Amino acid sequence: MVQLWHVVWHPPLGPPQTLPPANPHYPQSTTQPESLSRLNLCKSTCRWSRPRQSRVTLTVP
């Protein structure tokens, strides 16, 4: 499970093609809302996962 969200967290850094089709509302400004969405997801996932690792991943973007 940790690997799953880890893999989902990395794609956002790459091209917008890796982003999920859940940003048709703001395709231009997809980086900001996507980041917020991922941050919220990570926060609830990091709670039972490894908060230390999540912090390192958060500093990547």
Swiss-Prot record:
UniProt biased composition (Pro residues): 13-24
Positions of region (Disordered): 13-34
Protein name (record): Uncharacterized protein 086L
UniProt organism field: Frog virus 3 (isolate Goorha)
